């Protein structure tokens, strides 16, 4: 969605999801796809432009809009529409700091893992031609399965191919290898204008867990980013924005945290209430499952009944 007043611009990227004939809703793609405004836009432009965008969405048949705000780019985003809800914290590495300072801020357990991997001969390289992409996909899927991740964190092969084709040089695949075998890998996206490297997906081979390859990959990535002029390596947060072990793992590389928030806007209240019939919902309280009509209705099994397997 693009809105302009002739001088400044607002861009709201989203994925369109069909509901019924003529009705649909909007959601951010995987990751942090919040709205963007022109660099020189005054503070009041964003809210006015977003109001105009919401009106355009309503006229186009949109029922609701769910946006994942970028913890860095949308840190000062203010909107009077819907609800902006804090979901958790994310972690980033300040790449403008000298390497000695970055190493000093690295937790001792991570330093130990990185040094052990080095002594064992683990090497990290940038796979510029994505020759190891298939191996990375397998490792990533195995990692998500071990973590009991939901379907949201799994992607088909076309998704990866689209990343490679569409992002080109703005996508990095770094792999950790021991004796020429890929034991871990990570994908990073690059936003050169904003100076942000985004840690996108990563995985490691369970048989080589003692090498802790993800640690040396992130360490190498932040050095690459620093040497190539990037200002931040955004590592993200835990699964589902939780303060879990994944979040703590990322905190081991940097003390810098940022608020991750979502924005929920009901575009068409009448259609929203009609679609949400049978579910506990209110257009005044949007802090629960949103949009409410997409929440699965639990199946109630009468006492003493048996489910067929």
Please place each PLM-identified region on the residue numbering:
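A conserved beta-strand-loop-helix scaffold within acyl/acetyltransferase catalytic domains
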Residues: 1-22, 69-210, 223
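Aromatic (often tryptophan-rich) hydrophobic motifs at membrane interfaces
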Residues: 2, 14, 38, 42, ...
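Active-site/acyl-donor-binding loops of N-acyltransferases
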Residues: 15-18, 79-101, 228-309
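A gly/proline- and charged-residue-enriched helix-loop-helix capping module
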Residues: 27-74
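Mobile, glycine- and charge-enriched loop segments
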Residues: 31, 188, 195-197, 290-294
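Short catalytic-loop micro-motif centered on adjacent basic/acidic residues
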Residues: 66, 125, 232-236
């Amino acid at each position: 969605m693009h809105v302009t007043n002739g001088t400044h611009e607002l861009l709201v990227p989203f994925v369109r999801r069909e509901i019924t004939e003529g009705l649909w809703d909007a959601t951010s793609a995987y990751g942090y796809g919040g709205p963007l405004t022109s660099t020189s836009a005054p503070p009041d432009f964003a809210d006015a432009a977003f109001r105009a965008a919401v009106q355009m969405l309503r006229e186009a048949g949109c029922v609701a809009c769910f946006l994942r705000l970028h913890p860095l780019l949308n840190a000062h985003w203010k909107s009077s529409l819907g609800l902006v809800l804090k979901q958790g914290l994310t972690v980033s590495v300040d790449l403008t700091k000298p390497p000695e300072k970055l190493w000093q801020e690295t937790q001792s357990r991570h330093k130990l893992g990185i040094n052990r991997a080095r002594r064992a001969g683990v090497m990290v390289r940038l796979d510029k031609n994505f020759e190891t992409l298939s191996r990375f996909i397998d490792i990533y899927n195995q990692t998500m399965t071990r973590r009991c991740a939901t379907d949201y964190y799994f992607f088909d092969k076309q998704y990866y191919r689209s990343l490679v084709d569409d992002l080109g040089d703005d996508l990095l695949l770094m792999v950790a290898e021991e004796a020429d075998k890929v034991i871990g890998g990570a994908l990073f996206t690059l936003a050169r204008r904003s100076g942000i490297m985004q840690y996108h997906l990563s995985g490691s081979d369970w048989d080589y867990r003692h090498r802790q390859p993800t640690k040396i990959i992130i360490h190498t990535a932040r050095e690459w980013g620093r040497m190539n002029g990037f200002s931040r390596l955004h590592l993200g947060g835990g699964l589902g924005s939780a303060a879990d072990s994944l979040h703590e793992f990322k905190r081991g590389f940097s003390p810098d945290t940022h608020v991750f928030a979502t924005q929920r806007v009901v575009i068409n209240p009448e259609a929203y209430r009609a679609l949400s019939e049978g579910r506990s919902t209110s257009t005044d309280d949007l802090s629960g499952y949103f949009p409410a009509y997409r929440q699965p209705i639990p199946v109630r099994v009468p006492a003493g009944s048996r489910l067929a397997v």
